[in-house]
Regions:
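Catalytic, metal-anchored helix/loop core of enzyme active sites in primary metabolism
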Residues: 1-388
Length: 388
């Protein structure tokens, strides 16, 4: 019997957040929502608040605070606004687990606050570990905070390592779907990619930013950096394999050559429920695998055609603040692509220019990372005027 977990959902109106609330809705005996956080999707946030009755609702964009406050004025729900309010909400004593499903750099500060308070983190915001992996893992150890990955690949690796304490890990095999353009062979094909085509992922239902990252293979690059810190494994021991079926979510090879893999339907509710249940499995009625209908294939990623993956390996090799630069430039690149201001293939050009211009700092703190993130974003927006 799972003890009831009290959850703060950061990014409740996004793809991961809404799927997490589906899990809660199906297992109200196991989970209780105490905090909901959204950026500006007020209509959905208000509906979620009325359904789940959290103690606190936070709208991070303060311009929408009056609307949310008015809509919930007849309830006992406390309504707060702004980034500081998010950090305040996650450390409440009635929060056991903080699901960090905010997109991008914005998830870093509340994650740090929750870790410092010793909370359990269900980590979906991979950018947090990309930008500040060494700092995050060090603080988690110091404050006794547990970090459980929500990304399907990292959840798979985590599950493969259960029961293997003390057994040397030789290699992580990080699987990738390859995205919607996996079969493309020429640069010209990628240069002609439209936003609509890039948003059509073949296997997964995700938010716009993650879907574009998946199409460009940057998502796998960010996940590689995340895996480096989560599992204390050097980049040279993390191999990316394209697995178009998205059934094998990742694998781990041990020193004796044995390999463990975690398989399942491409459904984010599975790793979400595993993390929220603190690795205790909750029953569900989701579709099951039929192995007689499956074919598993593997390919090497084409890092010449999709240079973002190579750029991620390069950023990790440079170390220090280089991954922060990679992340900031990528966020601007994706934003510009979605707005029709930058071509699909040109996103990697913008990111490469940001990395080339940066001299990594070996030691850093939150203030330095915040200042660097802002500076790289500004510089990248300026470079947009010179890239097509």
């Amino acid at each position: 019997m799972i003890q009831k977990k009290r959850i703060a959902v950061l990014g409740s109106t996004g793809s991961i957040g809404t799927q997490a609330l589906e899990v809660v809705r199906s297992h109200r005996e196991a989970f209780e929502v105490t905090v909901l956080v959204a950026r500006r999707s007020t209509e959905l946030l208000i509906a979620q608040a009325l359904e789940f009755s959290p103690a606190v609702v936070v709208i991070s964009d303060e311009a929408y605070y009056p609307e949310v406050r008015q809509a919930l004025s007849h309830t006992s729900i406390e309504v707060m606004a702004g980034s500081e309010a998010i950090a305040e909400a996650v450390v409440r004593p009635d929060v056991d687990i903080v699901l960090t499903a905010m997109v991008g750099f914005s998830g870093l500060v509340p994650t740090l606050a929750a870790i410092t308070a010793g909370k359990t983190i269900a980590l979906s915001n991979k950018e947090t570990l990309v930008v500040a992996g060494e700092l995050i893992m060090s603080l988690a150890t110091r404050h006794g905070a547990r970090i459980l990955p929500v990304d399907s690949e990292h959840s798979a690796i985590y599950q493969c390592l259960v029961g293997e304490e003390g057994n040397p890990l030789e290699r992580i095999l990080l699987t990738a779907s390859g995205g919607p353009f996996r079969s493309y062979k020429r640069v010209e094909e990628l240069e002609a990619v439209t936003v609509e085509a890039a948003l059509r992922h073949p296997n997964w239902s995700m938010g716009a930013k993650v879907t574009i990252d998946s199409a460009s293979l940057m998502n796998k690059g960010l996940e590689m950096i995340e895996a480096r810190w989560l599992f204390d494994t050097p980049a040279e021991s993390i191999e990316v394999l394209v697995h178009p079926q998205s059934i094998i979510h990742s694998m781990v090879e041990f020193a004796d050559g044995s390999i463990k893999a975690q398989l399942g339907q491409p459904d984010m509710r599975l790793p979400i429920s595993y993390a929220l249940g603190l690795t205790e499995r909750v029953s569900n009625d989701y579709p099951r695998l039929n192995f007689l209908e499956q074919t598993f294939t593997f390919e090497r990623p084409n890092m010449e055609l999709f240079p973002n993956l190579a750029l991620a390996y390069r950023a990790l090799e440079l170390g220090g603040t280089a991954p922060c630069v990679l992340n900031a430039a990528n966020e601007i690149a994706v934003e510009a692509f979605l707005a029709g201001k930058l071509g699909f293939r040109a996103m990697s050009t913008l990111i490469a220019q940001a990395l080339e211009a940066h001299r990594p700092e070996r030691s850093y703190d939150l203030q330095l990372l915040s200042e660097l993130d802002a500076a790289v974003r500004a510089e990248s927006r300026e470079r947009l005027n010179h890239i097509r």
